[in-house]
Amino acid sequence: MAVCGRVRGMFRLSAALPLLLLAAAGAQNGHGQGQGPGTNFGPFPGQGGGGSPAGQQPPQQPQLSQQQQQPPPQQQQQQQQQSLFAAGGLPARRGGAGPGGTGGGWKLAEEESCREDVTRVCPKHTWSNNLAVLECLQDVREPENEISSDCNHLLWNYKLNLTTDPKFESVAREVCKSTISEIKECAEEPVGKGYMVSCLVDHRGNITEYQCHQYITKMTAIIFSDYRLICGFMDDCKNDINLLKCGSIRLGEKDAHSQGEVVSCLEKGLVKEAEEKEPKIQVSELCKKAILRVAELSSDDFHLDRHLYFACRDDRERFCENTQAGEGRVYKCLFNHKFEESMSEKCREALTTRQKLIAQDYKVSYSLAKSCKSDLKKYRCNVENLPRSREARLSYLLMCLESAVHRGRQVSSECQGEMLDYRRMLMEDFSLSPEIILSCRGEIEHHCSGLHRKGRTLHCLMKVVRGEKGNLGMNCQQALQTLIQETDPGADYRIDRALNEACESVIQTACKHIRSGDPMILSCLMEHLYTEKMVEDCEHRLLELQYFISRDWKLDPVLYRKCQGDASRLCHTHGWNETSELMPPGAVFSCLYRHAYRTEEQGRRLSRECRAEVQRILHQRAMDVKLDPALQDKCLIDLGKWCSEKTETGQELECLQDHLDDLAVECRDIVGNLTELESEDIQIEALLMRACEPIIQNFCHDVADNQIDSGDLMECLIQNKHQKDMNEKCAIGVTHFQLVQMKDFRFSYKFKMACKEDVLKLCPNIKKKVDVVICLSTTVRNDTLQEAKEHRVSLKCRKQLRVEELEMTEDIRLEPDLYEACKSDIKNYCSTVQYGNAQIIECLKENKKQLSTRCHQKVFKLQETEMMDPELDYTLMRVCKQMIKRFCPEADSKTMLQCLKQNKNSELMDPKCKQMITKRQITQNTDYRLNPVLRKACKADIPKFCHGILTKAKDDSELEGQVISCLKLRYADQRLSSDCEDQIRIIIQESALDYRLDPQLQLHCSDEIANLCAEEAAAQEQTGQVEECLKVNLLKIKTELCKKEVLNMLKESKADIFVDPVLHTACALDIKHHCAAITPGRGRQMSCLMEALEDKRVRLQPECKKRLNDRIEMWSYAAKVAPADGFSDLAMQVMTSPSKNYILSVISGSICILFLIGLMCGRITKRVTRELKDR
């Protein structure tokens, strides 16, 4: 399609074609002897040549002889040199003067119809050069310099004659002799048909010979100055011009130099058709080819696109002044400045049309077609059997070559550079993608109007897709996804101009260590999401892009490179530029991460490199639920229902986990699977990891550095949750994950792996972790108590079960049954207490008497468990951690409290730990069931001596020390078994030092203690002062129950001096001197001291003597007022009474009187005869 109307397959453009052709034409025409300008110039109006009137075709020249037609070679070469290097001037005519003057050749500037215009518009030094004048007049566009219609018409005839004369072919054959021999297609063209020039224009990109290239360039410029000169164009597009109303096609009716507008109009019609579902006007196939052909031919020199040249002439001077014309450089420069504020609107519009044509046919871009020619052929991206409309599309070229790059194939750097430019171009202007216009027109008008520059429209649509501004149709969403794949911004963030500009500052600070354009820049940005370095605008743009990248694993180039083999092997994926309608978004990545966390036993695992990439992606995407396609798709309704107010970072997933039991089945499965995955690799929780970084560095760096986590890191964080360095965010995050774990035992990876077989065997159909823990721990306890030969729970499960039990004691919320039962009590009594560190549990214990029945029962059960296994008492273990290391390093977990109690009064004991031990002793003494050692030791004694109390007792409620008080009394009577006696002695000794360890005393004497012994009770260290105060003030005590308790104390102290700390302290030296040989217990040392007191030869310590005398008085008083506890006590009281003779006399007299009455009055019953008895 150049000179002679043959449409060819491959066309290229070059630089400034309009001028050299005329020089060559002049050289050819100068061969005539004394004739006018010659055939190509026609007899213009004027003299000497018999010119035709304007608008008429010039008459045919007579046939020249062969000799005339072919001058000698030297003359030909001279003429060619003259024509090619004379800047277009015609050689002097041989003979008479031509039109417009005499001698020196015919001059266009001297023609009457153009003289005035040339003088006004063109510089004087160009007047003698026909080509310079033609170029000058041809490029005039300003209204004030408008060319007259007569001159326009003259120029039209002049150019038409130039471009239609077959004799140009002979010049071409001489000027391009060596080129023609190299280009086989052109050498085979028939002679005399005028096809030669057309062929050379077709192959202009391959012409290396300077003179030939200049000749063809000039010829092309003349042709492109008017669409009617493009042979065949008018025939192919005549109907379309009329249909689209693109202007007149009749000669002379319109300014010939505005005919570039006609081509521009047709181009707009072509691109508009592609952007409409049902176009009203369709451009014919022949005209489409012709339009794209013209665009291809003008691709190397923007002068050849007449409409764009005139529209952008000023902008070229402004932005691309130093850009040399040729090879499409000016086009590219203007494209790069398209969205500059100072770019004129008409130029921007012309550039957009040009870009849309490139999108339809990549050959319209000279640089792209040239740079990628070999690569396209190498990777079969222009297969002949594909529809041309498809293979020519820019998107197809980009996808095909990108696929090669992603497969690791070598694509030339020049081609990759061009691809980068055009990918950026597509991302920058949505209007260049017909699919976006077609599918997203409504969304753009509704949501994104006025945002047409620098990629902002596409990001606006992305924002809508993310659900931040409304809903987006599926067709539009698919079109966006396709465009993202075509442009592939994941491979180079610079392709996305909106992202590039928004994130420039972040990249300069946070990612400056990564090479510009590296795919890992996006990964770096994701790692800094929601950090101080991230800026809000960058955050939005990044998440908008990541939304689409997350839905197609191929859009992450690093992931694709490392995992394509695994994906093909395990997930049956297609090639990079192939898609499967059957595979939902994110399906391949879901497949990859399922295999990433398989064990060696499960087989079919990912390669190490791929696994690392999958983990990287998981860590990044966990920051936003919208980056998980399956999660967002299945949980959209639940997110709206439960989590509409959770808008802060990471809250949506936490919210879904909190409402796990309320979610729809599909959503629950997705959230459950993700949570299960997190339990194995908590680093997926990127926000939590970021918050916990200081703790990880200080306490968990060993496990954090492991490539395979397997739950170790979370376990470490839980263990160090209450370190001083722990910040609030990390603690809250760790606790939240613990709470989520309680919903399903699968969410605790180590527990699941250690116990899954045991759970299936012993606890089938149990899902909640707390229930599984209870089930397994109950089984373990039963096996232990029954001394089973073999435990039903495996050793590895028992070990992990212990870890889980200990973790659950730290926060009441980790024990859901207890938490639910005590919610109202927590609100009433512990509202100011923070969760964690078992503080709420401790608060409930302290307020146990005020708790609701259900909560009280649960707390009692908890205390019973803790006393049986003190290691489960979180507060005790925490407060006494160092003391346990010091005093009980080898103690069994179940004897831990017993060991601490034995060392409680050591000088090295920490006061806080001592206080905590006392608290636990107080609790134990409220009920024998809370003291496992006592319970076991007194197993036979309790039912024997305290049966009445047991019958009245209720399960899950304290006996307030009644059983222990009962055993104390029997201890005083020396009637307990030796094991039980040992335990009761310890209790009596401890309670004698601290009144709080005697619940019955505290219960019945609270008023007396407050009134009579307030100062002693307020002492920080209890050493028996309160008990001594009560004993001293026994006579002042009015309450019978309290008096009874004090008397019981006196009775107990009589049994053994060790249970009377005040007396024991006072008499310690005397015991050592006088009673050292006496075995302690059963009142033996007390009797020794009493004997020493009566022995006048023994001198006791004054304090000891005084205390002993006080005790004797108290015992004497106690004996008088204390009620008999049985017949033996009654007999003892009678025998020790001063009036025993009187009492015995009264008793004897009463018996005698009763006997006498019987003798005197006879029998009371009726007499019965012997017969009746024997019957």
Swiss-Prot record:
Fucosylation is essential for binding to E-selectin. The modification Phosphoserine is found at residue 957. It is a single-pass type I membrane protein. Cys-rich GLG1 repeats lie at residues 112-145, 146-208, 211-274, 282-342, 343-409, 410-469, 471-533, 534-600, 605-664, 666-724, 725-784, 792-852, 854-907, 908-975, 976-1031, 1037-1097. Residues 30-83, 89-108 are annotated as: Disordered. The keyword Cytoplasm applies. Residues 28-1141 are extracellular. Residues 30-53, 95-106 have a biased composition (Gly residues). Widely expressed; found in myeloid cells, fibroblasts, colon carcinoma, endothelioma, teratocarcinoma, lymphoma, myeloma. Residues 54-83 have a biased composition (Low complexity). It is found in: Cell membrane; Golgi apparatus membrane; Golgi outpost; Cytoplasm, Cytoskeleton, Microtubule organizing center. Residues 1163-1175 are cytoplasmic. Keywords: Cell membrane, Cytoplasm, Cytoskeleton, Glycoprotein, Golgi apparatus, Membrane, Phosphoprotein, Repeat, Sialic acid, Signal, Transmembrane, Transmembrane helix. PROSITE patterns: GLG1_C_RICH. The keyword Transport does not apply. The chain crosses the membrane at residues 1142-1162. GO terms for cellular component: extracellular matrix; Golgi apparatus; Golgi membrane; microtubule organizing center; plasma membrane. Its main location: membrane. Binds fibroblast growth factor and E-selectin (cell-adhesion lectin on endothelial cells mediating the binding of neutrophils). This is Golgi apparatus protein 1. It comes from Mus musculus. The gene is Glg1.
